[in-house]
Every structure is written in structure tokens, then in C-alpha cells.
């Protein structure tokens, strides 16, 4: 099997404006889904997501996208950040969104346009 470069991408803890971070892992197996990729740790103190004395954070793959720069079978991996114990990290806003999306998945979305007109006699 040929080797594939997977770029793990996540949102850091910078305030007031978070930034994107990434690091690359090389795998030698086929990746069809984000579930085919392992969780990966990182030092949260360098991304303002943890204190220096207990800085382990965890990246969990959530989506894969074909890498438009490297091409081939290489992938971009969109990740969420978790604490080392597996709990949701405070910088992980997407986890709450997933929870709400699951809760309301059977609801229908409706969108409409309201057009207002004014007639003025001059």
C-alpha cells in the first residue's frame, strides 16, 4: 500500500481570534472515512489550549477532504479538540453544534422571504 499524507487541522485557543493549526501524519492504509484515522495528541500549551504542567490535548478526526494542494490520495482531516480524558475541550464549539444537530435532526427547516412595499403619493 502506498503512503498517504493526512493533515490534521484544528482551531486553536487564541483569543480574541482563534487560528488554524495543523500537523501531518503519514499512514500506509486506505482511508475511506474519518473513522479510519486514529486520534492524535498534541501539546495544548503551545496553542493556548492548556497550561504547561498538564498540556496534553487530543485531536479527533471528524471529516476528511481530498487535499487540493498535494493531490493524489492525500487528505485534509478536520478535527475537534478534546481533553486528554476524552471530555470536550472548552475551545471546541463544534461539539455543542453536533449535539444540537442530533437533537433536532428530525425537524424541518423552513426559509421564506418577506417582501415589503411602500406606496407613496407625491
Cite the ranges covered by each PLM segment:
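ATP/Mg2+-dependent ligation/transfer catalytic cores
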Residues: 1-120
